Design a protein with these regions (language model features):
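Structural recognition of alpha->loop->beta junctions
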Residues: 115-130, 135-138, 186-214
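Glycine-rich, charge-decorated loop segments at or immediately adjacent to ligand/cofactor-binding or catalytic sites
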Residues: 106-110, 182-190
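Functionally critical loop-and-helix segments that line ligand-binding/catalytic clefts
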Residues: 31-44, 50, 189-268
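Aromatic-lined carbohydrate-recognition surfaces of secreted/lumenal glycan-active proteins
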Residues: 168-183
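Hydrophobic anchor at the start of a short beta-strand
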Residues: 94, 170-172, 196
Length: 268
């Protein structure tokens, strides 16, 4: 009986220890040297198991956050307004982003849907929005380039960005990576005037896509939604002044670009 009790206590102790090991957050990836201004980007996926730890982010020195607002013309992140407001209340620079769906066409409609759900304040803490252009996730049943030719894809992107710029008064930012951008756009070089946020999970600065001579933000580490506080990690290429330059009051509005001819796409 005593032996059985001892074995039971041992087994329970191991179970508790195992659960603690699983639940203990892994240390976040080290911020690259020479890039002092760090931030995060989040979506509804980051709420699957844990709340967003805004106080912890401020304590670790996080200075900005991007929050996913929409995708396509039908999905709006249910956590967007709460996360956006919490980040602002924590004193962070905050921006919104949209996950583009080239496979669904209607780039102007997608841009307008995004603007109808995002929060815009022309102050010194609201960051220019970005358009997420990357590989389709597992639930999107297309090839890596959304079943589009480079000409079709770049036409979609131009129409999307033109609509945002016309309505916002300044160029939006593009989020992408060289490994997707170059083959899917055919090494198109016509987007270099836009600020770019590059995903590159390495210890050295990201490889630039065709058309760019520098980057604005570097996403240097991916998040893991199974770990508390482990979010996508970013740094600004520069210092605090470069982050502030992405806020509304730091750049004078630019003239709206001319609308491009209507763009359509076949149904997938």
């Amino acid at each position: 009986m005593t032996r059985h009790r001892s074995l039971l206590v041992c087994a329970l102790s191991l179970a508790v220890l195992s659960s603690l090991i699983v639940m203990t957050p892994a240390p976040a990836a080290a911020q690259p040297a020479g890039y002092p201004v760090g931030g995060i980007d989040i979506s509804s996926n980051d709420h699957l198991r844990y709340p967003i730890e805004w106080a912890a982010e401020v304590a670790r020195g996080t200075r900005f956050a991007y929050v996913k607002a929409t995708e396509g013309t039908s999905y709006a992140n249910p956590y967007f307004h709460g996360d956006y407001g919490a980040a602002r209340s924590a004193g962070l620079y905050v921006g919104a982003y949209v996950f583009a769906r080239p496979d669904r066409g209607n780039p102007v409609g997608q841009a307008d849907f995004f603007l109808s759900h995002a929060e815009w304040t022309r102050d010194a803490k609201t960051l220019v929005p970005f358009v997420d252009l990357e590989w389709p996730y597992s639930g999107i049943h297309t090839d890596s380039c959304y079943d589009l030719s480079p000409a079709q894809l770049t036409g979609f992107i131009h129409a999307f960005l033109d609509e945002l710029e016309a309505r916002l008064g300044r160029p939006p930012m593009i989020y992408t990576n060289s490994n997707w951008w170059n083959p899917c756009t055919g090494n198109d070089r016509s987007f270099g005037r836009y600020p770019v946020d590059l995903a590159s999970y390495t210890t050295t600065p990201p490889r630039l896509p065709a058309g760019w001579t520098t980057f604005t933000i570097w996403q240097y580490a991916p998040g893991d939604v199974s770990i508390d506080g482990d979010y996508d990690r970013d740094v600004v290429n520069g210092g605090e002044a470069d982050l502030a330059a992405l806020a509304w009051t730091r750049v004078h509005p630019v003239p709206s670009p001319p609308r491009r001819p209507g763009w359509t796409i076949r149904n997938p």
